[in-house]
Design a protein with these regions (language model features):
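Generic marker of "main functional regions" within proteins
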Residues: 34-37, 41, 47, 51-54, ...
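C-terminal recognition-helix end and immediately following basic linker
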Residues: 2-63
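Intrinsically disordered, low-complexity regulatory/activation regions of eukaryotic proteins
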Residues: 1-3, 79-243
Length: 243
């Protein structure tokens, strides 16, 4: 090989190395300049940049659980795996749906969807969330339910300029009914407080129909009968707080 051929070969290798020196870690596209590579924005890189959005975080965690339950792979999944997944859009959509409806317990809801083998395309269904919520309200810890209900009344009573203990007495009934259907005010508070019982007794037929599935009197009566010690504890707590 002549000296000219050696130099030409060396230059070719150097140019080749330069051309492939900067590449996108997401799509593997090569760039001659680092600045160009940094400015480059492929779909996978855009998804990575959105990783800290609350809805995206929920979507990622739900996707990880989905893979744990549906594959035998033991290799931990990363967010890079997630952004390249065919399920990315569906799970991010689910995450933002949970944020939008202020889902009571995202992990429990995701597990419920997986347990009931609900197709991912239906994870953002209001009907499915309502089914989950009705079941969840009857299964959750009573003190957690009361804590959430009290926090809700404190926040909204402040808006309506009334005392929190009087929220069920003087708050907007239609708004309270909506809070019941979203799980923010639990049947534990409605049935085990004086103001809650009065609230239920003053509802019109339309309001009763709206919340009936969430406060099913027969089912909750059975639950209370089986949990007499907790009922007594909840009653005492609510009475002491003036509810």
């Amino acid at each position: 090989m002549t000296l000219l051929q050696i130099k030409t070969s060396k230059n070719t290798k150097e140019n080749s190395a330069t051309k492939s020196e900067f590449s996108c870690e997401f799509c593997s596209r090569s760039f001659q300049r680092e600045t160009t590579m940094i400015k480059h924005l492929c779909e996978s890189k855009r998804r990575w940049q959105d990783k800290d959005l609350p809805g995206n975080r929920i979507g990622f965690q739900s996707w990880v659980e989905f893979y744990k339950k549906n594959t035998t792979s033991k290799k931990p999944k990363t967010y890079v795996d997630f952004v390249k997944s065919a399920y990315y859009i569906a799970f991010v959509k689910f995450g933002h749906y949970c944020i939008g409806i202020k889902c009571i317990n995202v992990n429990r809801y995701a597990n419920w969807l997986l347990k009931n083998q609900i197709k991912i395309d239906s994870w953002c269904s209001d009907t499915n969330y309502s089914k989950f919520l009705i079941q969840f309200l009857k299964e959750e810890d009573a003190l957690d339910a009361i804590a959430r209900s009290i926090e809700t009344t404190i926040a909204l009573a402040k808006e309506e300029k009334i005392q929190s203990k009087d929220y069920l007495r003087y708050g907007n009934r239609n708004r309270i009914c909506h809070l019941v259907t979203t799980g923010k005010i639990s049947p534990w508070m409605l049935y085990q407080s004086e103001s809650g019982v009065d609230f239920l007794g003053n509802l019109d037929e339309g309001q009763q129909r709206l919340i009936m599935d969430y406060i099913n009197p027969e089912q909750w009566a059975i639950k209370f009968k089986r949990n007499t010690e907790m009922v007594a504890q909840v009653k005492e707590l609510l009475n002491a707080a003036g509810y």
